[in-house]
Structures are given as C-alpha cells and as structure tokens.
C-alpha cells in the first residue's frame, strides 16, 4: 500500500466512526485531492499533533506572526502560512482544493488546529499592497528604478486603483464560521471555536499585545519579531516620500469609513480617532477607475509584466527543521525571551554554515588543548644511572 493509499484508508476508517464528519471527506475524488494537497504541503510527514494555519489576506502583519511562531513553536507545531488558493497554486501546484478544505481535513485527522487572521486599518493596508508590487506589476519596472520615480504620478495611479485593492477579510468573508456580534475590545482578539477548530482574529494595531495574547491562547511563551517592512526594501525612498506626501481625496476617505470590516474591528472611539487622523490629510475628491476600467488596467498590467515576483525569502525564520536550523532557532528564542534582539535570519544555508564553523572552532580548541597539555617526561637512562652511581660513592 503506497503512502497516498494508506492516508486514504486511514481517512475512510475514521469516516465510519464519524457520521457527522465534514461532507467533502465522504467523496473519494475530493478526498484524494485533499490528501494530495496535504502531501504537497509536506504535512503527511509531520509527527506533531498541533497545526497552526496563519490564513490571512496579504499585508496585514501575518509574516511577523509566522516567523515568531516558527521560532517558538516549531518543535511542537506545524506552521502553515497561506493567503489564498492562489498561494496554494503558486507554491505547491494545488489547484482543486480550497484552503478551508485543507484546514478541515487536518481536524478530521484528529489534529489540534488553530487558524489565525489579522485585520489592518484599510488605508494603510491599501498603501502597503500597492507598494508590494509597484515595480513588476503597476509600473512594469524593477523596484530600484521605480524608487526614483516622481511621486505625483505614483499617487495618481494609487488613487485610481484605491477602491479595488485591500478590501478582503478572511475571518468575516472566507472562514465560513459564526461571527460574534462584536469584536472583543477588552481582550483585543476574537476566538471562535467551530468544528473543533480554534479561529483567532487579531488586529495589527494591537501588535504590542500579540505576545501576551498568543502566549495565552497557544499555551507557550512567544515573543513577536518584526518582519518584512517596506522600509527595508528597494522602494523604501519612494515609500517614505509617499507616506509623507500623500493626501487622501475626501470621497475615498468617506467611502473607507463605511467599510464593514473597519466598523466591526474598530470601536466608535477608534473609528473617530482614525477619521480625525486622516481628515487632517484630506484633499479634493477625485474620479477613480470604474469597474470596467480597473478590469482593463489589471489585464494590461498582467500582459505587460515580464518580471517574476514571488516572495520566498521574506521570513525572519524560513521554517526549516533540520538540526542546524533547530540549534540556531533555540539560540534565537533564548535571546528573545531574555529581552535581547537578533539581527539575522534563520535560513538553512546560513544555519548550516554557522554550525560547521562552530564545530570547526570547537575541534580546533580541543586539538589546541591537547597539544598544550604537559605529558609525563620520559626517563633519561644515562642521567638516572649517573645519579645512582653518585649516591653510591
């Protein structure tokens, strides 16, 4: 029996004992697809009973959470970072399975499953999303050259696409779970348990409390590390200039304040503060792209784009669980728990090289110690006999 067949057999065995199990599990074709997706994500090899899906929209602060969880939980949990089905397609060539099905399947296998999502204030997120692909997508150029562009056409382009980017929220729109009547503004998070899966919703504005929240909910000490900020990228000068220069058209601000996600995750006072902050940066209303114009814009950008843009190296911890990475991860975790910082990444090549260098240094120290040891002096026969003869005289 091959590995896939064994997984299928085990799943079918479970179905017999769970009459109320997830519907898609009972369809063999779909089940095989989900099992294959699990294999492609390497979850079939895991010996951990807990899996954490950081399943969020892009540019909300999720990368920081992923790296933090990898540093502190990799020895007990699997951590999976997914934005959407497109992520599954690009990274693992998974095309016929949804993220929710993968999540449900892991619960079906008896795993302890957490799903974490984050909300970020809408205007800031739109800016971040726009700059994420400003070179290869919006201006069909490399970031280092776009970094030197005049700010006026950049602002004009951003305003035109403003209504169409950064509008999704996975917790409300994609998880298909009951949503509490209001966000818990006291605890700074929402926890919903559905089908035995724990869904956690955080807010980026509360990131300074994330370590306390996640330590409590996950039952292990966690320190949050900063990760992948636009100020560290090739377009940082343009990004800084944009944030300093940008004034929001009043009609875009008014539309933003009507956002259902903003009105759910922010209290009345928080929304008033947010509005007050941006009303000081308002400007005259504009006419943006309409839906058809934006669709044409998307098509044109895709056709013109010739620069591949897939981010694979933007984590402080890339998640490798080899011995070298685990050793470095333990060192980093200890530093963070002691209030110290770290300025390196945990990636396999660097960790392996560092371990080899460390071992070489240790071997050299041992060899040096051995060579410097004072060995017992061999007896000199002639000298000793001379002493004996002298004593006998």
Name each model feature, range by range.
Residues 2-269, 274-283, 297, 372-373, ...:
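PAPS-dependent sulfotransferase catalytic domain
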Residues 1-50, 296-393:
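Juxtamembrane luminal stem/stalk of type II transmembrane Golgi/ER carbohydrate-processing enzymes
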Residues 3, 16-18, 152, 233, ...:
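Generic detection of intrinsically disordered/low-complexity segments and helix-coil linkers/edges
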